[in-house]
Amino acid sequence: EKGTQTLGKAMTKEEIDYIVDAFAKASLRAKQSGFDGVEIHAAHTYLINQFLSPYYNRREDEYGGSLENRMRFLLEIYTATRKLVGEDFPILVKLTASEFFEGGVTFDETRSVCKKLEEIGVDGIVVSGNIHGKADTMIGESHDGFTIQAEGYFHEYGDIVSREIKAPVITVGGLTDIDAIEHIANNTGIEYFALSRPLLSEPKLIKRWQEGDRAPVECERCSKCRTKRGNFCVVNKDRKVQLAAM
């Protein structure tokens, strides 16, 4: 891996069992700490996504090969988590719509994973995509038959999933304009919208929109808000002044 200069290896069954248990216990701690639910991150080339991806997963045991095998790790994490937190605690799963490169997870495979997750009781699916901060340069590109959009990058993919499962579907990425969000809500089966960077830029954004000021948020989607000093917007002028005074 170029960033960390580390060489990956296939996890042993003991290591897999340890991670499954760790995910479940982390979710239980979240519940005990007062959180309303948890989201299992199975996208963006993190560990669970690597198990799902035929590009990264070259295993020859029960965790590799077929899609059924590649999704086994995720399903074990969900099942172990549900056992610890109970039926009344929401568990969401974030998935990659497509990895957008040859040999990676396809949208058809992701749709199959979504259907399986619904079958075992997931409370919601967050449909994202593997773009590693390049979304703005990929707007207008079509992959697996659908197009990355300027507002709500992956909502075309999310809309398809929403028509195939009954569990709520959430879209994430490139959501800065309330008019565009309302258009997506009114014209697709997507029920919820996830925002992060816009709220770092403007923490009271939702309140402003509710009060009638519908101007888009001052967020350049640059992802420079992830800094060594913490997560904060480096674009918003008011936030810069506040940070300088800290």
Indicate residue ranges for each PLM-predicted region:
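Flavin-dependent oxidoreductase catalytic cores
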Residues: 1-246
